[in-house]
Design a protein with these regions (language model features):
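Short secondary-structure "cap/edge" segments that initiate or terminate local elements
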Residues: 1-106
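Extended charged/polar low-complexity repeat regions
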Residues: 68, 84-166
Length: 166
């Protein structure tokens, strides 16, 4: 919303959030007309907490797994671009860019705080919490390699499987 665009202090933004909703009619951005809506449908505790969060972006122009312009927290994927880079779709639906690597190489994205590695099993992202996201499956119909697993260094793992269409 407008609070995020203004770059306000996050603590102050939490205080102002309720006011902004009343004044600006959230989830609609009054300046752009963009609709942004998010829901956490369920959470399961554990070594790798499962948090199912849905997000709607009115201007996303994408046919997501939950419908047009809908994104969810496990819709993570990488897509190789012609420019020698990968687009990485984050849990919140944003995309950032990562370089194509040779086997055994690594790259650290300072802005996103992600370590990007190519090993014998495929591409692996490690976040600041130490969670590892594996992308070793086939491309889906949109050209993304979807996350196939999330694991901890202690060996706990969530595994994702997809139908042939992605």
């Amino acid at each position: 919303g407008l609070i995020d665009k203004a770059g306000l202090n996050p603590r102050l933004a939490r205080i102002l959030k309720k006011t902004a909703c009343i004044i600006f009619g959230e989830p609609v951005d009054a300046a752009t007309g963009r609709v942004y809506h998010t829901n956490v449908d369920f959470e399961l505790p554990g070594p790798i907490p499962v948090v199912w969060k849905r997000t709607y972006y009115s201007d996303a122009a994408m046919d997501g797994p939950l419908g047009y312009n809908w994104h969810h927290s496990y819709n993570l994927g990488i897509r190789q671009l012609e420019e020698g880079a990968f687009a990485f779709r984050h849990a919140d639906g944003r995309e950032s860019f990562l370089p194509v690597l040779k086997l055994g190489e690594s790259h650290f994205d300072r802005r996103e705080q992600l370590a990007w590695t190519l090993d014998g099993w495929g591409y692996l992202l490690t976040d600041i919490r130490g969670l590892q996201y594996r992308f070793d499956g086939p491309e889906n119909r949109s050209g993304y390699r979807m996350v196939s697993g999330i694991s901890t260094k202690d060996g706990f793992r969530l595994r994702f499987e997809y139908a042939s269409g992605g």
